[in-house]
């Protein structure tokens, strides 16, 4: 849900904060919407714990309907550090959130409380000493080259009115290694077919240019032939991917599309694969199949730290075997042995 279309459902101070990070701090709109959702979950939790009798028969559907308009600054003043820890425990047990997801939600409310204290709307920041959970470094799931081709083949050969759009989406994920928010945010003006380039707005509103291969460029051009035309007065006029309602496609929409495409290609055998897995797949294939330099992959992915890129570069056992067999020391020993035989 967009924070812009929900302002009448929010307390004024929350709207001020969301506008501040969007228009002053220049966060991407998709990032602000994610932060808004994180804060909204926390506000609903506050209301639920304050009115335990009203919400004793807890259901997820009931939780989603809790209005946050009446969360006052006085209620926020009552928030203590132990309540933040209890909230994180709630996220873990009730929402089954991973450490990574809990940390993201904690980061959202930490920054919110920091702003509230900095602007003198609150006298105390209860999150200041709350620590982030330790995240186990697990290798993300990914598809093989053959499986990637199978996914694209099944997607383009599906009889659906959105087949061409869906194919372009999956093609971009696998070839350009984009984050979900980056794909959703692509505008028509970001694409230059004559230069085969795509301008991406990534985390922290940072922009980067990536190059399109022929397959990806063709998939986008084919989609543009069937993409609905919007009037220039429409706020989504410039959006590349549109939903059936002729609005900029949402993150959830893309997730559902990818889930359906994966199901068609693999039934339920790839139920652990999601949109971020496709980004990971693209980076892994670049490294293993095309021998792409890790520094190049870092630029394509938009990572600031090389350590963030390293998790995307699986080296297969076969590849490792080839490297070890072809290592410099091995070849020197072989040459030496060969020369000794010649002398004999």
Regions found by a protein language model. Give the residues of each.
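Conserved catalytic core of the tyrosine transesterase superfamily
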Residues: 1-344
């Amino acid at each position: 849900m967009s924070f812009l279309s929900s302002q009448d459902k929010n307390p004024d101070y929350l709207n001020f904060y969301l506008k501040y990070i969007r228009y002053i701090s220049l966060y991407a709109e998709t990032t602000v919407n994610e932060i808004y959702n994180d804060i909204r979950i926390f506000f609903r939790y506050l209301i639920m714990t304050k009115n335990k009798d009203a919400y004793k028969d807890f259901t997820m559907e009931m939780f989603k309907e809790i209005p946050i308009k009446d969360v006052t600054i006085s209620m926020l003043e009552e928030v203590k550090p132990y309540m933040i820890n209890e909230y994180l425990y709630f996220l873990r047990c009730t929402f089954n959130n991973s450490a990574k997801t809990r940390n993201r939600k904690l980061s959202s409310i930490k920054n919110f409380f920091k702003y509230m204290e900095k602007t003198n709307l609150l006298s105390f920041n209860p999150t200041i000493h709350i620590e982030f959970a330790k995240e186990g470094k697990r290798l993300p799931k990914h598809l093989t080259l053959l499986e990637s081709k199978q996914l694209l083949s099944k997607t383009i050969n599906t009889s659906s009115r959105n087949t061409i759009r869906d194919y372009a989406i999956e093609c971009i994920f696998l070839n350009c290694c984009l984050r979900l928010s980056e794909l959703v945010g692509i505008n028509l003006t970001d694409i230059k077919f004559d230069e085969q380039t795509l301008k991406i707005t990534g985390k922290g509103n940072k922009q980067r240019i990536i190059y399109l291969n022929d397959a990806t460029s063709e998939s986008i051009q084919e989609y543009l032939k069937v993409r609905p035309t919007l009037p220039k007065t429409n706020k989504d006029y410039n959006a590349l991917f549109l939903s059936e309602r002729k609005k900029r496609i949402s993150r959830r929409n893309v997730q559902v599309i990818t889930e359906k495409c994966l199901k068609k290609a693999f039934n339920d055998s790839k139920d652990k694969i999601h949109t971020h897995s496709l980004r990971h797949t693209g980076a892994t294939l670049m490294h293993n199949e095309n021998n792409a330099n890790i520094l190049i992959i870092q630029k394509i992915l938009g990572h600031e730290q090389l350590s963030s890129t390293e998790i995307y570069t699986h080296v297969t056992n076969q590849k490792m075997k080839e490297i070890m067999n072809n290592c410099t020391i091995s070849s020197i020993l072989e040459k030496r042995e060969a020369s000794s035989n010649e002398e004999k």
